[in-house]
């Protein structure tokens, strides 16, 4: 693949190259690593140990303002009224005919502050267009947020060593704002692996290399390996991927 300026490089791009990424695809207009060793080797690392993924391609969409909740609810048929601050929920985004525009994980970061973590597709453009004619007081924009996924049965040990016991005790689909060595983060008990895992949302792209290296060093005692989202494990786990398994016609 030829790298060019029309596609975004993640804050972890240089780190992934140093750690052996040898193939990339374009996902949400971002280069995403698809292979370091082999899909099979990465599968066994995922199910036996722990892996670190660069998933900056999950380009976050922030929705804020007094009408943020009402706007979120307009985008999905799922009842979001029970989503508390600090909680995440899976949701499908639908158009006026009920067609699935995308699927996403919603993170409620604050009382009137939400992040959408979508699959592949121009969700930011779509949501911005919906907001224009909604009559609601909301802002829709892309924040400076870049996620990593820490996935595998040993992920809780790495998270504990990085953040403390609260990371092990965190409930599934909940989040916490925190810092690591002064780096601003949001950590959630979510992932796309069918294994135990976390997503670590970097809130300042300047710390990409530093955060990647910090997590990899913490994972050494647990045989951590860099990896790509694993199709084998996603099929085993029954997890759907937008475009591959879900389309606007569904």
Provide a role label for each language-model segment:
Residues 54, 103, 199:
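Acidic active-site catalytic centers that drive phospho-/nucleotidyl reactions
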Residues 66-100, 154-183:
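Internal amphipathic helical hairpin motif
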């Amino acid at each position: 693949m030829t790298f060019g300026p029309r596609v975004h490089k993640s804050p972890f791009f240089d780190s992934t190259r140093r750690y052996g990424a040898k193939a990339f695809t374009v996902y949400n207009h971002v280069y995403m690593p698809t292979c370091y060793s082999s899909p099979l080797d990465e599968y066994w690392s995922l199910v036996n140990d722990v892996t670190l993924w660069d998933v900056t391609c999950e380009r976050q969409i922030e929705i804020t303002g007094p009408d943020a909740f009402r706007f979120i609810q307009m985008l999905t048929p799922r009842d979001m009224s029970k989503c508390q601050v600090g909680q995440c929920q899976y949701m499908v985004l639908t158009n006026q005919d009920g067609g699935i525009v995308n699927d996403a994980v919603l993170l409620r970061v604050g009382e009137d502050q939400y992040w959408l973590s979508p699959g592949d597709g121009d969700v930011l453009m779509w949501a911005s267009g919906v907001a224009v004619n909604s009559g609601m007081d909301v802002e829709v924009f892309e924040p400076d947020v870049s996620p990593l996924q820490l996935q595998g049965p040993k992920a809780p040990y790495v998270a504990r060593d990085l953040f403390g016991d609260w990371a092990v005790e965190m409930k599934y689909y909940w989040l916490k704002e925190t810092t690591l060595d002064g780096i601003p983060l949001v950590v959630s008990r979510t992932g796309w692996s069918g294994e135990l895992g976390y997503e670590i949302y970097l809130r300042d792209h300047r710390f990409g290399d530093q955060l990647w290296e910090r997590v990899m060093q913490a994972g050494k005692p647990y045989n951590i390996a860099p990896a790509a989202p694993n199709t084998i494990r996603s099929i085993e786990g029954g997890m759907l991927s937008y475009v591959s398994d879900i389309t606007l016609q569904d």
